[in-house]
């Protein structure tokens, strides 16, 4: 799409997702068996025919770098690219210092592409969005900044930027992560919050970033600094995510922030139980890096019948005489006879021995489980070995070898 440049903020450290983010950045965390979190925003841009994309990386970016390098390319299409921009200290000996500073440090690359409109989007939310529709709304209002927004329960709003709008959709109030969020007029149970997706007129963004960079008291963050400075004096409009339409899908406002282990687990489970999150819409294909693996194999073993119910099983898996229920199994996992896995996420490359029990757990990549190990039945016992989320999800770190002592 001419005149439009996408900037994806993908430097998130994701401390609340540890141990899943010990060796990778938050956008690189695997999701749904075959994807990574960043795939959702990349698909939103590509499916919207916005094919000039910069991905800004910083923390533990090697896993993310390889995923994008291997799985995302628009080579051969003139003027189109998906390029990664790691922190390069172009503005002095410092890393990206806030979301706004990350864009500011890359103004040279942005201006070289001479865009009229610049999309600044996050990379760690699960949702589908035709960004062209938000862009049309932005242009129709001659907005200098447009912020996408969604309704959330009032008790959850304090984790987001809370917005007030007038009847024409113009922003008239904004508070970043307030202690006492303001509800939507006439709806005391909900607040309108920012999704962290912005479309700027290029000249406005340049000017505001320069102003912010020279403010020693700024945290250089879009939510904390840029938006509060803009909306009182400039045309800042709010795009209602509920109006967005994806072909062959009904939009009920499915959008998830997977910033915690419990949110990550429940959003993965939505793939199995929530019809509002689907991966098989051919009209809105979800691309990713797909390794060259054979189809999954399911084998009975003596008197042990393999059983798979309400689960997603990825390529390369070999499941022998095991029972899998309400679970997501990533690439190339080997699961032995007599093992029972339920309400769990196995991120890939796991080796799980025979007669194991795994319940309500997340196993990171390259985990090896000895025969007979039980995980998730006794949380008190599990606390001495693993991370336990507030809702009782057991998390086994990458590369762990369990039960071989």
Give residue ranges: language-model regions.
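Left-handed beta-helix
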Residues: 1-5, 203, 211-405
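Short aromatic/hydrophobic "clamp" motif used to bind/position activated sugar donors
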Residues: 118
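N-terminal glycine-rich phosphate-binding loop and ensuing alpha1 helix
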Residues: 1-73, 77-80, 90-92, 137
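Active-site-proximal specificity loops/subdomain of glycosyltransferases
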Residues: 79-103
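Active-site acidic Asp-centered loop
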Residues: 121-123
């Amino acid at each position: 799409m001419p005149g439009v440049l996408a900037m994806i903020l993908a430097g998130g450290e994701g401390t609340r997702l540890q141990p899943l983010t010990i060796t990778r950045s938050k956008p690189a965390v695997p999701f749904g068996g075959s994807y990574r979190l960043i795939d959702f925003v990349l698909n939103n841009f590509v499916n919207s025919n916005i094919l000039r994309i910069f991905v800004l990386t910083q923390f533990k970016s090697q896993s993310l770098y390889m995923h994008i390098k291997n799985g995302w390319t628009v080579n051969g299409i003139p003027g189109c690219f998906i390029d990664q921009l790691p922190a390069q200290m172009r503005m002095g000996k410092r890393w990206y210092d806030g979301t706004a500073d990350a864009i500011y440090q890359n103004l040279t690359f942005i201006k070289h592409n001479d865009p009229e409109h610049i999309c600044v989007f996050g990379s760690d939310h699960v949702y589908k969005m035709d960004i062209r529709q938000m862009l049309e709304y932005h242009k129709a209002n001659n907005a200098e900044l447009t912020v996408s927004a969604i309704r959330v329960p009032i008790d959850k709003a304090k984790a987001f930027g809370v917005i007030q709008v007038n009847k024409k959709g113009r922003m008239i109030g904004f508070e970043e992560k307030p202690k006492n969020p303001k509800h939507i007029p006439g709806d005391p149970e909900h607040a309108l919050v920012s999704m962290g997706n912005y479309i700027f007129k290029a000249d406005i963004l340049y000017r505001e970033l320069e102003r912010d960079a020279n403010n020693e008291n700024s945290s250089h963050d879009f939510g904390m600094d840029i938006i509060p400075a803009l909306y009182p004096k400039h045309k800042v409009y709010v795009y209602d995510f509920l109006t967005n339409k994806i072909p062959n899908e009904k939009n009920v406002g499915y959008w998830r922030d997977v910033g915690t282990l419990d949110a990550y687990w429940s959003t993965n489970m939505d793939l199995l139980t929530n019809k509002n999150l689907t991966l098989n819409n051919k009209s809105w294909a979800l691309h990713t890096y797909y390794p060259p693996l054979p189809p999954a194999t399911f084998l009975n073993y003596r008197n042990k019948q393999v059983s798979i119910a309400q689960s997603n099983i990825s390529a390369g898996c070999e499941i022998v005489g095991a029972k899998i229920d309400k679970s997501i199994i990533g690439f190339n996992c080997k699961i032995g006879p007599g093992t029972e896995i339920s309400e769990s996420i196995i991120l890939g490359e796991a080796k799980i021995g025979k007669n194991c029990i795994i319940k309500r757990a997340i196993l990171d990549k390259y985990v090896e489980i000895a025969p007979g190990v039980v995980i998730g039945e006794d949380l008190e016992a599990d606390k001495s070995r693993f991370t336990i989320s507030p809702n009782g999800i057991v998390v086994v770190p990458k590369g762990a070898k369990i039960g071989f002592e």
